[in-house]
Amino acid sequence: FVLPVSKELSVEYEAGEDEWIKLLPQGGNPNRIRVIAGWKPNDTTANGRRQEAKLIISNKIDGSGREEYTVVRRNWGLPVTYFNGVWWCKYNAKGNVKDFNDQVLSSDDPAVKVGKTLFDYLQTCTPEEFFELWKWEYQGDSGLGLQVIDDNGVVKLDGYDHNTSIHMNKLDPRLLAPDGFEIPSMEEYNRIFSSISGTIWLMWDGSHKTSWNGDTTIQRRQRRRNDVKIGTVELNDLIYISMYNNDHIDYEPIVWYGASAQWNNDGIYHGHYNNMLFTVYSPKGEGWYFTGSMKGLYSVVNGAGTKDTRIIRFKKSDVEYIYE
């Protein structure tokens, strides 16, 4: 907005509404104002509701001569945690990546509803609840989730296509995410997995260092589920791994969980079900993968190929204004 010197711009909200709009004077000129909308981490009201505010132009001297402009948006939110400079989503993607209704929403976070972190929730939730979160992977550019199924005793992804020729990691980072979110970059994954202190042995509790922010120590804790079943098959030793930085103790750990990648018609069992392959934004096609056996499970740089299925974990796209 560029206002006459006699005018001012203000914002009005209905009672109880968050102050989600910010007015920023530009170039030191109080009459040249940029209006931006903000984001609230873990907003428990962000269920797609209509969020409204009024921009008011009026005379500075007495508030008369009001002009009102109503601004409306749909307020959606996903649960997040702050880790090494990134607002990571807590949960893997589910269903249609573009559809908020398919995702775990910050207004309906199952872990928060029972007063737990996600790491603790995955220990105590029912096998059915665990499987519902764990079973989703993606392939190509459709953004439509593939679900783990029992195919006559073979655990595989329903709808797997061995002829897929699109490398997910080379796609635009916003293509496979809902509005306001995106696929984290290789550099952002490196802040967590690119160890400068040796191999990250994921099957054990421990710690490792990365070079992010000079020198960052990341603590690791792991747990297993042995009570999950799909059809006739028992899915034993399903690992989920908590990682946290002591510099961010106000935020809960990030938790890695999910099914092994599938790269042919033989399914997702590779001696176990924990060879997770992550969707990473990398024009070079790089990525991160949990490789090895359950006696030696570790993270490696591996972008894999076009036929491989991947777990999707969103991050919040950068924003200029965060409100509480």
Predicted features along the sequence, with ranges:
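Conserved positions within compact, well-structured domain cores
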Residues: 15-16, 22-324
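Extended low-complexity, serine/threonine- and proline-enriched intrinsically disordered segments
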Residues: 1-22
